[in-house]
Design a protein with these regions (language model features):
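Conserved PLP-binding catalytic core of the aspartate aminotransferase-like
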Residues: 172-173, 177, 183-217
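Active-site pre-lysine segment of PLP-dependent enzymes
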Residues: 20, 37-48, 61-82, 86-117, ...
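PLP-dependent aminotransferase-like
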Residues: 1-55
Length: 268
């Protein structure tokens, strides 16, 4: 009680959920409904009263990166801690990481995971970079045996061999650009630029389109239509060139079919 978490939705929802479990007040600073970019002035103002500000960068599911100038302003304004979750950070362009600010912002934490770029989602392993006193405080409340030895061994190999993953990440970046550009050309689809390994799109009857992608094409995408601020939005993960080509063709066909069906129904 008495603590405040500042959240920037639409974003990864678990932080707000666990804050509520801990009886922490959640203040939502909503993103622009058209661009999904943060309202910078409102965010800095809210940060002045915050115990913790959480920024996901690249943001899930919108894909935008928090500008370093904004992160610095939030750190300067916030009397508490500022957490930048960079779970998808390896897919962003070089120079986007908030790690560059750690030396000047002693209330900044940068969170990473091996679940995304390193394909170790099942290992449930990540790490945080922060000032020594912040790390000591986190260590004091860390669950006992929080990372088992098998996960530690797998994580060590992944980090030591990180260059082996670089070609895969580079291909995902290139395919992300191709996927975004192709989706943007489909009539009836809006796509947002992304620095993650996914692209967010909006189309009419998104939930039905998602079901038809699954049932008729065996293609799975994430339906965010239920989430506040994300009406009719789908998140499409970047796959192989062949998979991306298949989803582009399937989505174009289904969106056209749904539009024709809606027009036919209107004329009946």
């Amino acid at each position: 009680p008495g603590r405040t978490l500042v959240n920037v939705p639409p974003c990864f929802s678990e932080y707000a959920f666990f804050a509520s479990l801990a009886q922490t007040r959640v203040v939502d600073v909503w993103r622009d409904p058209e661009t999904f970019l943060p309202n910078e002035e409102a965010l800095v103002a809210a940060a002045r009263e915050a115990s913790l500000v959480v920024l996901t960068s690249p943001n899930n599911p919108t894909g935008d990166v928090a500008p370093l100038a904004l992160v610095r302003r939030v750190c300067e304004a916030c009397p508490g801690l500022v957490l930048v979750d960079e779970a998808y950070g390896e897919f962003a362009e070089e120079g986007a990481s908030a790690e560059a600010l750690l030396a000047e912002c002693d209330n900044l934490l940068v969170l990473h995971t091996l679940s995304k770029a390193f394909a170790l989602a099942g290992a449930r392993c990540g790490y945080v970079i922060a000032a020594p006193d912040v790390v000591d405080a986190l260590a004091a409340v860390r669950q006992i045996y929080s990372v088992n030895v098998l996960t530690q061994a797998a994580a060590l190999v992944a980090v030591e061999c990180r260059e082996e993953f670089s070609p895969v990440v580079a291909q995902i970046r290139a395919e992300r650009t191709r996927l975004f550009e192709a989706l943007s050309r489909i009539e009836g689809v809006r796509a947002w630029p992304s620095e993650g390994n996914f692209v967010l799109v909006r189309t009419a009857r998104a939930s039905r389109v998602r079901e038809r992608l699954r049932d008729e094409y065996s293609i799975l995408v994430r339906d965010f239509s239920y989430a506040p601020g994300l009406a009719d939005c789908l998140r499409i993960t970047v796959g192989t060139p062949e998979e991306n080509g298949a989803v582009i063709d399937a989505l174009a066909a289904l969106v056209a079919d749904e539009a024709a069906a809606e027009e036919g129904g209107a004329n009946d």
